[in-house]
């Protein structure tokens, strides 16, 4: 028997034709306002049937917008779950899918996300393929929005303990994803969500990602890729390769965001110069309210070589230790100050041969000038 989600075609993809498909080229969806389940491979349909939400079970409230991005929009929605009843959800529309292969990759990511079950990881309710339009991602509604906006809110007065506690929750979620061999690639405070109980959920991976925000830049070697440069590990900036250890680096930046109540990292550094800056041994400074022990944990996340960085399991233990050592209630205001502006780089500079050519030339010019 057919699954309820597959009883009839929900969408029709207008492909570029059999010739293009047969030639191995990407199949372009000429009319991106409509797309067909029959165009998907049968084996993929069999895999994806468990994540499909029938169109009649989803109401998208398009007049109630949660947010908009270049990649799509997010709306309030109601999912009529056959077991749990009506659920308040977030519905993300995708406007930028133009190839059939992208739709299939999208659905494979949905299969992967549906398998995540952890209190600190945002779950996927399902994917809807409407009769008219492109796929919709259905996610639980997060009442308090993203972590960065939450800690930046003027009306809130989070304590150091509370902020570190948020970081610990993120570390727990990332520990789970690392055990699942899943690399996030875009870990940042803006990509973690808070529900009504202030439980932090690691989010914005896979289907939920929108990489067209102001925090994303093209870098010289990859002009067409939009990357979260200020959160990226040194080796990722150099090779555009990501691992769990590069996620650990990003986690260190996230902790810095929390202890500065959402300040932007490296505001004085041009995004095109990030690799050069880091190769000099420089890192983010210690926020004034940040305990020395916690800053030591951050620095360990930013070790030059991935092997030197802790695991997420190790970070969970370290953060629990830091929290246990704190006494009293310390509040952080929005004026960001630092305690180590006069100190030198925390790591030695890379050998001259590893610096960009222009950097070596600048060093030579400085020596001549002296």
Swiss-Prot record:
Compositional bias per record (Acidic residues), positions renumbered to this chain: 357-370
Domain (Protein kinase) ranges: 60-323
Keywords: ATP-binding, Kinase, Nucleotide-binding, Oncogene, Phosphoprotein, Transferase, Tyrosine-protein kinase
Catalysis performed (reactions): L-tyrosyl-[protein] + ATP = O-phospho-L-tyrosyl-[protein] + ADP + H(+)
Pfam families: PK_Tyr_Ser-Thr
SMART domains membership: TyrKc
GO biological process: cell migration; cell surface receptor protein tyrosine kinase signaling pathway; phagocytosis
Broad class of enzyme this protein falls into: transferase
Note: This protein is synthesized as an Env-Sea polyprotein.
PANTHER family noted in UniProt: MACROPHAGE-STIMULATING PROTEIN RECEPTOR, TYROSINE-PROTEIN KINASE RECEPTOR
Entry's family note: Belongs to the protein kinase superfamily. Tyr protein kinase family.
Name the record gives this protein: Tyrosine-protein kinase transforming protein SEA
Species of provenance: Avian erythroblastosis virus (strain S13)
Taxonomic path: Viruses, Riboviria, Pararnavirae, Artverviricota, Revtraviricetes
